Amino acid sequence: MFPHVMCADVYRVDPADPRAPPQDVWERLTPEERARVIDSLPSEWPVSESQPPEGDAHFEAKVRAREVLGGFFSRIGCKLYLGSELPVYYPGEAMFAPDVIAVMDVEPHARMRGMVSAEGRGLDLALEIHVAGDRRKDLERNVERFARLGIREYFLFDRGRLKLSGWRLMGEGRRVYQPIIPQQGFYFSEVLGLELQLEGERLRFYLGRAPLPESDELITTLERMVGEAEAHRTEESQMRVELEQQLAHEQHLREEAERKLAEALDELKRLRSRAR
């Protein structure tokens, strides 16, 4: 079977080996033909890319990483796309789907697939989380492939061995990774402007050595803030009640003093009248 068919500049995707067209072919396609090509690229894992399930540890690690990064960049107003296991198509390349990807300075809308020729740019960062299966894919083949494709940074969190590794393209136009050397256990990402480090069994992200809060930590913090606010409101309410009681008591004392003064004046007036 021929992997792809091109006839009269029309490119048809082979379902058994789905690939985006080479860049020169893409540039010859009309807008309508390009749209058909994009729609024909699978948004699910083809059999050739299938990987065995890696369980809760794998799922939780990738979801946590995406949520933490998404929350941080949303708060600072930075425009980027973060995806998880999104099928990515480089020109003429077999599809791949890293656990987490980052593409800077693009619209963050939801995507069914990432087609580099259509987007006009490729990935800036890829993160893989290895728990089970073929370690060589993450540790060796991805290092060569991601560098060749021009992905600026690649991080690998080996969850089973509790080891973090990172690679970066060094120099303009170079397509060979150099290892990122950790500083006191922190791996700096130029793409994200953040540091990565393992904390126990978790991959954490840091800004200025301060960890970015995770969802459970944010919930705990918000619950504490709500509790403190409610306690403060209760305290203020109690103080207001006590103040109202004090004002009422003072008002009663004033009224009592005025009554006694009036009685004294009346008595004085009566005594003066009798003295005459």
Residue ranges and their predicted role:
Residues L82-G83, F155-D158:
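A structural signal for short, well-ordered beta-strand segments and their strand-loop junctions
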Residues G55-S84, Y89-F96:
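Acidic-basic catalytic patches of nuclease active cores, encompassing PD-(D/E)XK
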Residues R152:
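Short acidic/polar active-site loop segments enriched in Thr and Asp
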Residues F2-P53, G71, V88-P98, V103-L125, ...:
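C-terminal interaction segment
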